Every structure is written in structure tokens, then in C-alpha cells.
């Protein structure tokens, strides 16, 4: 926006930037603009001030760039999983699933999934080599990792949909154009050699006696002073906490780093579950560590391998080494499990609003680090009916008076329900819920049923603040940061549940 300033005064740096743009035919791209004696930062500052003064027309364009992630760099060095497997398959003719797992224990699932897209799928426990131009197609992917050619949109699109291989970065590029006022300012400028600021050296040398100083218009609009406000996410977290506390819940804490024993095994998630793949979970290297409550591992082993009282378990050989791996927690339900294990006398009503981590490619709707809202009730009165009641009550307090509960699937709850809300006439999934499976209750030594529900805080924030890109929640956009209270007040949370 241009701010009308009478009798515009420009600095020498601004004048030189105008002349540099003029020498390029009155239009220039900021990143390509160079002015002798001025740094890139000084040029950027001058452009911003010239725009404010109405002397430049500025067009902003978003430029997307792509770079290899740490996983992508690994594939560049070692070869894509599908290429490694295909070449080994070509060498041997056929391979069993055990041979494939031994060859590439961390990436065999990725390799199998990618080869399946070329029609190579396991038959009777074996993968059989087939030659139909597949190797050339895979090698083209490998060559792209070397070149990262931005013009190869097909490869960019392919790898954007593969989690964790390439990172997308967005930068804003400014294209600046002189307008009529700019030419007038250039013609009228007579300030070369003007002193813009007085410092001790100028006073000590006496230079100030013979030099001219830059004029300042004391009536010019000044920058808006922005008072300190809570970040919108902090504000929303406090709102959620207040809702839970007013409902009589107790807040629980947790750890960013968890053992898979607690993060997954305690919740009856099998050790070969896809969620454990390195493409979905951040694993942490550690020389030594102590697992809290190690005694639970015996019970976990028994229930995973053989089940109990008519429940069959998973029927595989449970691995203590796998259980001792460390991860950045993938959900906050691990905190619920530990809290109830340590406080196993019902009733208990607990909650948390804390960060979790997923190995996701960051885009408009995904983050690798985000907040999860978790609520749970442990009581002899827990049932599907009480779960439905408390969900309707909780979501109504968030402002969603019209919700639907749809049968779903989660590894550690049965039955499971997705929560669907209505926003501006559209139905949007906003959370999951369910009753802990009997196997989970047995592992944790619980005496009564447990109902739990959760949702992503960022998705809720996007609805409240009218955003379409989750990354905007963490950008330093001062207009958004200073007006988010107004957005809540204007939209009214109580209206979100209405069509």
C-alpha cells in the first residue's frame, strides 16, 4: 500500500537504487539488482521505503525451489530403494521376502511399494524379475536426484508425493517498476553527499560545519508501534487448557523422546506396523538409556505374542531390541498410557496439549512438528454412549454444535470414531476417538474402560483464524499476529458449528 507523503524526500541510497532501476529499463528483479557501495540488505531496505513513499510499483511472486532432504541425500549416495532392489533382483532372478528384508531392513517397504507401481508384486512369498523398461524408468529418477532439474516437473511431482525425499522452499521475489513520481524524484534530487545521521566522528572533526544534512519531514507517517501480544497458538492452547480444566480434567506431561516400548508396544501396535517405518517416524540414536517401568515389557511380550483370555495377540516373535529403539514421540497417547499405568485407580480424567513429531514433507497441510490435543477418561462408567456424550460436550465448548461421529479404525482403540464438524456448510474431519482395546487395558493393568480422543491443534487454528496454509501459523506476519483476536471476535467461535 502506498502512503501519500507530501514533498517526498529520498535518501542518497534510495536515489541510487532508483537510478539503478532506471538503467535497467525502469523494471528490475530485486535479486538481480546491484548498486555499488550498497549491500543486498541496504538495497532491500531502500526498495521497501521507496514503495512506502509511492515511488515504486512492486509485484511479488512466490518462487518454489526444491532441495534434497537428508533422506534424499542418502538415496543419492546409496541409490533409491527401488533401484537397489531391482538391480539385486535382476542379478538373482527372484528373491524371497526374507531375503529382501535382510538386504534392506530400513527401506524394503518403500522399495516394494515403488516396484509394485511397475507391476512387480510378490507372488507366493517371492519377487520375480521382469524386464520391460523398468530399470530405465527408475534410473531416470536416480539421475534427477543428481541434477535436481527444476524444469523436470514430472520428477518434482513424483518426489513431492514421496515423504521425506525432497524439501520444498518458498521465497518471495519482488519485481520493481518506476512510476511517474519516481522520475520526478530522480529529477529533483540534489542530495548527493548529504549526511543522513550525525555521529561523534562528524562532530569531532568539524565536518558538520561545511556539510549539508538530509531533510526530515516531521509530518510524515511513522511506523505503527505494535504492542506485545501472545502468539495465536499460545492463546489457543490456553483456551483449550481452560476448557479441560473447567471440565475437571488434570493436565499431564510427557517426553519428546520415547522408547518404542512405550510409544507403540504399550498400545498394542505390532512391531511390523507401517507406522514404525523410518519414512513416517523420527528415530533417535543413543548409546545407552534407561526405559522407565521396564517390568512392563514381560507383559507386553506375552500379549503381543500369545494374547490372553480369548484374545489371540499378533502371533509373532516380539523383539526386545526393537522395543528399545528411541523415537520422537508420534502421538501424545503414550503420555496417557504412562499416566494411567502409574495412576491405575479409577476414576481419572486427564488431558494434554503438547507437540508430536512425524516424518512428513512440509506443505500447505502437513508439518513435521505440531501440537496434539489429547483427552482421556478412565472410569467404570465409560462406554460408547458416554464417549459420544463427552465428545458432543467438548466440541460444543470449542464452538462446534453440529458434529457427526463416524466409525473408523485406530490401532489401539475399538470401537473407534472419527469426529466430523460442519464449517461453512462443509463437513470436515476434526479428530479421532475410541475406547482402548482390551489388550491395551491388560498391558497397562487397568481395572476399568478408558475412552480417549484427540485432534491436531493446527487444523483447529486454521479454522479459527481463516487460514488455508498451515505454515502461515508460524510465519512472522505481523498483520496476522496483531489482528488474530479480532478474527476470533468477528467470526465468533460459537458460530462454527452452524451451517
UniProtKB/Swiss-Prot annotation:
It is found in: Cytoplasm. The keyword Zinc-finger does not apply. CDD domains: PheRS_alpha_core. Its cofactor is Mg(2+). Keywords: Aminoacyl-tRNA synthetase, ATP-binding, Cytoplasm, Ligase, Magnesium, Metal-binding, Nucleotide-binding, Protein biosynthesis. It catalyses: tRNA(Phe) + L-phenylalanine + ATP = L-phenylalanyl-tRNA(Phe) + AMP + diphosphate + H(+). One of its GO terms (molecular function) is phenylalanine-tRNA ligase activity. Its EC number is 6.1.1.20. Coiled coil: none annotated. It is an enzyme of class 6 (ligase). Binds 2 magnesium ions per tetramer. Pfam families: tRNA-synt_2d. Belongs to the class-II aminoacyl-tRNA synthetase family. Phe-tRNA synthetase alpha subunit type 2 subfamily. Tetramer of two alpha and two beta subunits. This is Phenylalanine--tRNA ligase alpha subunit. It comes from Thermoplasma acidophilum (strain ATCC 25905 / DSM 1728 / JCM 9062 / NBRC 15155 / AMRC-C165). The gene is pheS.
Amino acid at each position: 500500500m502506498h502512503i501519500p507523503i507530501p514533498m517526498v524526500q529520498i535518501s542518497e541510497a534510495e536515489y541510487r537504487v532508483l537510478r539503478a532501476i532506471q538503467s535497467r529499463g525502469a523494471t528490475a528483479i530485486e535479486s538481480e539488482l546491484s548498486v555499488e557501495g550498497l549491500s543486498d540488505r541496504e538495497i532491500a531496505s531502500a526498495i521497501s521505503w521507496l514503495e512506502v513513499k509511492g515511488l515504486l510499483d512492486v509485484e511479488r511472486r512466490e518462487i518454489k525451489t526444491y532441495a534434497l532432504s537428508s533422506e534424499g541425500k542418502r538415496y543419492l549416495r546409496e541409490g533409491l530403494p527401488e533401484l537397489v532392489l531391482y538391480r539385486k533382483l535382476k542379478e538373482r532372478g527372484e528373491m524371497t521376502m526374507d531375503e529382501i528384508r535382510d538386504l534392506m531392513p530400513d527401506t524394503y517397504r518403500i522399495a516394494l511399494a515403488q516396484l509394485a507401481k511397475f507391476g512387480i508384486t510378490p507372488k507366493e512369498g517371492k519377487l520375480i524379475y521382469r524386464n520391460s523398461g523398468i530399470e530405465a524408468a527408475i534410473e531416470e529418477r536416480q539421475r534427477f536426484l543428481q541434477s535436481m532439474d527444476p524444469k523436470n516437473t514430472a520428477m518434482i511431482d513424483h518426489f513431492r508425493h514421496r515423504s521425506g525425499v525432497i524439501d520444498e522452499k518458498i521465497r518471495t521475489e519482488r519485481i520493481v517498476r518506476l512510476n511517474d513520481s519516481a522520475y520526478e524524484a530522480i529529477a529533483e534530487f540534489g542530495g548527493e553527499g548529504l549526511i543522513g545521521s550525525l555521529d561523534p566522528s562528524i562532530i569531532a572533526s568539524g565536518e558538520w560545519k561545511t556539510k549539508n544534512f538530509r531533510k526530515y519531514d516531521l509530518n510524515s507517517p511513522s511506523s505503527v508501534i505494535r504492542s506485545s501480544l501472545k502468539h495465536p497458538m499460545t492463546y489457543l492452547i490456553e483456551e483449550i487448557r481452560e476448557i479441560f480444566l473447567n471440565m475437571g480434567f488434570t493436565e499431564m506431561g510427557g517426553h519428546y523422546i520415547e522408547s518404542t516400548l512405550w510409544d507403540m508396544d504399550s498400545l498394542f501396535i505390532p512391531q511390523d506396523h507401517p507406522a514404525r517405518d523410518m519414512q513416517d517416524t523420527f528415530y533417535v540414536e543413543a548409546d545407552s538409556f534407561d526405559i522407565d517401568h521396564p517390568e512392563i515389557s514381560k507383559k507386553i511380550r506375552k500379549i503381543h505374542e500369545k494374547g490372553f483370555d480369548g484374545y489371540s495377540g499378533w502371533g509373532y516373535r516380539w523383539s526386545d531390541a526393537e522395543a528399545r529403539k528411541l523415537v520422537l514421540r508420534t502421538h501424545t497417547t503414550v503420555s496417557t498410557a504412562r499416566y494411567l499405568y502409574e495412576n491405575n485407580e479409577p476414576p481419572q480424567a486427564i488431558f494434554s496439549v503438547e507437540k508430536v513429531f512425524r516424518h512428513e514433507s512440509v506443505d500447505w497441510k502437513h508439518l513435521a512438528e505440531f501440537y496434539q490435543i489429547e483427552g482421556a477418561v478412565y472410569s467404570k462408567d465409560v462406554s460408547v454412549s458416554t464417549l459420544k456424550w463427552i465428545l458432543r460436550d467438548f466440541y460444543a465448548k470449542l464452538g462446534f454444535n453440529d458434529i457427526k461421529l463416524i466409525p473408523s479404525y485406530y490401532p489401539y482403540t475399538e470401537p473407534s470414531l472419527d469426529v466430523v464438524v460442519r464449517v461453512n456448510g462443509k463437513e470436515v474431519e476434526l479428530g479421532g476417538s475410541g475406547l482402548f482395546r482390551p489388550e491395551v487395558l491388560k498391558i497397562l493393568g487397568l481395572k476399568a474402560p478408558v475412552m480417549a480422543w484427540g485432534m491436531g491443534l493446527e487444523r483447529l487454528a486454521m479454522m479459527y483464524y481463516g487460514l488455508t496454509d498451515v505454515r502461515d501459523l508460524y510465519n512472522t506476519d505481523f498483520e496476522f499476529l496483531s489482528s488474530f483476536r479480532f478474527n476470533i471476535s468477528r467470526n465468533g467461535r460459537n458460530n462454527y458449528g452452524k451451517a
